[in-house]
Amino acid sequence: METMNTSETAARLRRAITRLNRKLRHSSLGGISPAQASMLESIEKRTNPSLGDLAVAEQMKPPSVTRIAQTMQEAGLIILVPDLEDRRCTRVQLSALGRKEIAAIRRRKTEFLEKKLLSLSGTDQHKANDLVAFLERLLEES
């Protein structure tokens, strides 16, 4: 029986996940930029974040986040609200359109994966299902 090189397997898994994530991001954008899509998801994960909070979360410079946020507000995806306690701070909320866009992004990602899975043989579809179960277990253990 051949001995598995776990280091090489881990590196291959990391590369495959990175490539899959990149493909999912590009397949799901619709009419918004990757930075806008990422910011929408960051806003959704946080309660009433400030632009500074988003700059940290997105690992971006504050002026870049401000510029993207202004574009997103103009598109109706978010609402910029002055902080009542600190007038220097601006808080960010998702608009109804922003929530719809997040749902559309997720739907497009799922459709992309579903299309890929449907192109596989039945045997490979079962292997993919087993792989998902494995990844879920792996993440639960972390």
Model regions and ranges:
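Charged, amphipathic alpha-helical oligomerization/scaffolding segments
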Residues: 12, 16-19, 97, 127, ...
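A structural signal for well-ordered alpha-helices, especially hydrophobic packing surfaces
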Residues: 17, 21, 102, 136-139
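Charged, amphipathic alpha-helical coiled-coil/dimerization segments
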Residues: 70-130
